[in-house]
Amino acid sequence: MNTTPDTPTPRALRELTPLEARILGVLVEKQHTVPDTYPLSLNALTAGCNQKTARAPVMNVTDDEVTTALDALKHLSLVFEGSSSRVPRFEHNLNRVLGIPSQAIALLTVLMLRGPQTAAELRLNSARLHGFADISSVEAFLDELATREPPLVVRLPRAPGARENRWMHLLCGDVNVGEFAGADGGGAEAVAPSEFEALKAEQKRLADEVARLNALVRRMASELGIDADAPGDAN
């Protein structure tokens, strides 16, 4: 599908960090879903990044981390800071930097916020950003994004048992699509590299917490003269 004649010329763009991509996704989303509060304040933007629903992975970032990422995005001209309010407010410039139409921006936004999606899922989840007539129109824009140089999305191999291929954005860099080839097709989503690192960190945190609690239980049992390893009363 061809872009509109007045689509801006795309600019070269470095790989984004997961937080930078999340910020852009939140700005586009809130521009359409809560236009009365757009451009967004720092507090609203951080809350949108940490939102528990419609996000994969769920993040827990601070205002300072968001501010640092915003500074980097402003340097790339991807975000502008407004000066008409006492409270700094931020808006995206994604369509001009990438040189793509609003339909493609809607699809990229959902991919940045929710992770890999099928074309059908993208049509459903982007409804508040752009109303696609059918799945074919979604696929047409995805194909165009995938054939750009450099490509902005990639079609992932179909997982065993899955009926449709999923798509993933490439704003955070290339992915090894082979990692997704053997993914379980039973409804679980394949994990992106950034998500995998977050999961490993969370696993380590939980393991450390379990070890700390075990040590606490043993110390309390020792103070009470109880054998912490003894089996409990069966009655």
Swiss-Prot record:
Q: Which domain of life is it from?
A: Bacteria
**Source organism per UniProt:** Burkholderia multivorans (strain ATCC 17616 / 249)
Do you know which InterPro entries this protein is assigned to?
Answer: DUF480, WH-like_DNA-bd_sf, WH_DNA-bd_sf
> Member of which family?
Belongs to the UPF0502 family.
Taxonomic lineage of this organism?
A: Bacteria, Pseudomonadati, Pseudomonadota, Betaproteobacteria, Burkholderiales
Record protein name field: UPF0502 protein Bmul_3231/BMULJ_05293
